[in-house]
């Protein structure tokens, strides 16, 4: 298994068609469920620095989506279970409008349909509504 630092630079230097999925599991396993606020903050800061280096290398046609499968507030100490925050859905690339606010209406079906429309894959059997036409530049 490659780390984030190993995997994403490879994606920027190799041509391929399709989708690459990277799971940043440490945010959840090492910091969120362990209620390690300082570790979570350090990991978020490291990820921010990584993005600052990664984003300028995105090519025409590249699309980056960042989201989460659930909340996991490291400062909530009553339980180590998932917490109930809204999760982010950040989309960027040269073909995406900047500064769009899609609100809180999104679900995984929306994300799946958006990916399918972007990749020109039939998604007629999936739930959700694509937001690709709203966000494309």
Placement of each model-derived feature along the sequence:
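Feature captures the catalytic ectodomains and active-site-proximal regions of enzymes
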Residues: 1-137
